[in-house]
């Protein structure tokens, strides 16, 4: 397979996995607080990576890294992107939030020019623009009235852009599986920090679905819910994270960005 096709396939299938994750999180947004959902997702994803995928790569030594700072900043970028996007879909429809968030490929292309010194020609620029317009035609978000919550997917897009610029600029020596593993470790740690902080703050969030989703108290979880988190959230995010990390590590960000829209086809 042509190397470019390999990168395109990785980014398209990776973003499809992310879409499955987003739909599942939307379904849980009225039932379980975000930090609890991210905690279980991280536990399951780490287990999948450690005990299902990692043995094929030589075991725990494969997780060795000489650049922990790189993984911390990537982890914070992903946590930021996920948090702001998932808060937004507690209030907005998934179509509306996605329409705003999918400014990200255009941002990635622009940032790649300035921070990675990538040459972005007319074809790549047009590909991004056509992809964005095509996305609007597919999901038909309608008229998005301006509300404060509408800014959140845009903030998520900025964090998502930062993630891939960091990966492309500093991740050449890191393995995709390693990057995926440490992202889930960041989710595990931050979910517990958020849970503890919100518990101590005792925030009254009854008037806002988004605030309730962000700060709510943990709830009991059924076996079916755990299975749904495993299959609909943890498994897709584990596979998608590895695929997208591989793509942005090995291919120019401005080349890949338009293909982020491919998940919508």
PLM segments and residue spans:
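Transmembrane alpha-helices of multi-pass small-molecule transport proteins
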Residues: 32-80, 159-162, 166, 183-199
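Transmembrane alpha-helical segments that form core, pore/gating elements
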Residues: 26, 49, 145-203, 212, ...
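Glycine-/small-residue-enriched transmembrane alpha-helix faces in small-molecule transporters
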Residues: 1-36, 145-169
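Helix-helix packing/entry segments at the starts of transmembrane helices
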Residues: 40, 98-103, 171-186, 238-265
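Hydrophobic transmembrane alpha-helices of multi-pass small-molecule transport proteins
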Residues: 123-140
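Loop-to-transmembrane-helix transition segments
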Residues: 7-12, 60-84, 148-155, 205-239
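Hydrophobic/aromatic residues within transmembrane alpha-helices
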Residues: 28, 37, 41, 88-89, ...
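C-terminal transmembrane-helix exit sites in multi-pass transporters
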Residues: 104-126, 263-265
């Amino acid at each position: 397979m042509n190397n470019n096709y390999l990168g395109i396939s990785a980014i398209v299938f990776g973003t499809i996995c992310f879409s499955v994750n987003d739909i599942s999180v939307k379904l849980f947004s009225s039932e379980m607080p975000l930090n609890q959902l991210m905690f279980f997702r991280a536990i399951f994803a780490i287990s999948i990576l450690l005990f299902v995928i990692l043995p094929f790569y030589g075991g725990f030594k494969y997780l060795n890294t000489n650049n922990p700072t790189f993984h911390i900043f990537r982890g914070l970028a992903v946590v930021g992107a996920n948090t702001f996007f998932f808060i937004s879909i507690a209030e907005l429809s998934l179509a509306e939030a996605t329409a705003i968030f999918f400014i990200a490929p255009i941002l990635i292309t622009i940032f790649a020019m300035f921070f990675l010194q990538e040459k972005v020609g007319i074809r790549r620029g047009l590909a991004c623009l056509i992809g964005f317009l095509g996305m609007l035609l597919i999901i038909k978000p309608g008229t998005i009235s301006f509300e404060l919550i509408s800014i959140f997917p845009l903030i998520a897009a900025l964090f998502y852009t930062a993630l891939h610029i960091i990966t492309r600029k500093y991740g050449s020596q890191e393995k995709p599986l390693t990057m995926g593993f440490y992202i889930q470790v960041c989710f595990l740690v931050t979910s517990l920090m958020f849970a503890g902080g919100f518990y101590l703050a005792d925030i009254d969030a009854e008037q806002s679905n988004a605030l309730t989703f962000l700060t709510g108290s943990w709830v009991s979880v059924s076996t079916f819910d755990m299975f749904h988190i495993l299959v609909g959230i943890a498994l897709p995010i584990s596979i998608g994270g590895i695929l997208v990390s591989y793509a942005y590590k090995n291919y120019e960000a401005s080349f890949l960005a338009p293909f982020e829209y491919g998940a919508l086809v």
